[in-house]
Amino acid sequence: MKGLHLHLVLVTMTIVASIAAAAPAAPGGALADECNQDFQKVTLCLDFATGKATIPSKKCCDAVEDIKERDPKCLCFVIQQAKTGGQALKDLGVQEDKLIQLPTSCQLHNASITNCPKLLGISPSSPDAAVFTNNATTTPVAPAGKSPATPATSTDKGGSASAKDGHAVVALAVALMAVSFVLTLPRHVTLGM
């Protein structure tokens, strides 16, 4: 058991180091630093984000709601980074459209991803904004423990970030997702090492 724990730590560190080393340094990393813990919270949504669950769990929705209430631009940033996160997130099975559905699926009041370009300080007509405007209409899914509600729009103001921000944060998110996946394996399963 102790050997498996050490192996998990080493695998996590290797994943983070390799992805961070491959990613170019990003300007304006302040938003990435600010939203770092929010990536960790979103790992509670991994089952929904990978399509293993048809609805987000209550823990997932509580985490998403906390992000939205505390700093809504970080929720936008998480979605944006999933879009620009590259093959590593796709290899884990993260479905971009599921992340985009989170505010609606968790039935957050006063939340709409159409506000994300403004919160992130990107031009609504830019290609970076397309992830939010092209996918703004999603079918709501009732999450576990929530009753149906109609999302409204947000009036929160936010800072700015470029689409390239947060590669190190994405690496951390990928590592956390990988660890979450491995921890869900039955105890008798070995990792082949």
Swiss-Prot record:
InterPro entries: Bifun_inhib/LTP/seed_sf (IPR036312), Bifunc_inhib/LTP/seed_store (IPR016140), LTSS (IPR043325). Pfam families: LTP_2 (PF14368). Residues 1-22 form the signal peptide. Glycans are attached at residues 110, 135. Disulfide bonds join 35-76, 45-60, 61-106, 74-116. Disruption phenotype: Reduced cuticular wax load on the stem surface and in silique walls, with altered cuticular lipid composition (especially C29 alkane) associated with diffuse cuticular layer structure. Increased number of plastoglobules in the stem cortex and leaf mesophyll cells, protrusions of the cytoplasm into the vacuole in the epidermis, and enhanced susceptibility to infection by the necrotrophic fungal pathogen Alternaria brassicicola. Increased susceptibility to penetration of the epidermal cell wall by the non-host mildew fungal agent Blumeria graminis f. sp. hordei (Bgh). It is a lipid-anchor; GPI-anchor. Up-regulated in the epidermis of stems and leaves. Expressed in the epidermis, stem cortex, vascular bundles and mesophyll cells in root tips, cotyledons, seedlings, leaves, caulines, flowers, siliques, pollen, and early-developing seeds. Residues 138-161 are annotated as: Disordered. Its main location: membrane. Belongs to the plant LTP family. Lipid transfer protein that, together with LTPG2, binds to lipids and functions as a component of the cuticular lipid export machinery that performs extensive export of intracellular lipids (e.g. C29 alkane) from epidermal cells to the surface to build the cuticular wax layer and silique walls. Involved in the establishment of resistance to the necrotrophic fungal pathogen Alternaria brassicicola. Contributes to pre-invasive defense against some non-host powdery mildew pathogens by preventing the penetration of the epidermal cell wall by the fungal agents (e.g. Blumeria graminis f. sp. This is Non-specific lipid transfer protein GPI-anchored 1. It comes from Arabidopsis thaliana.
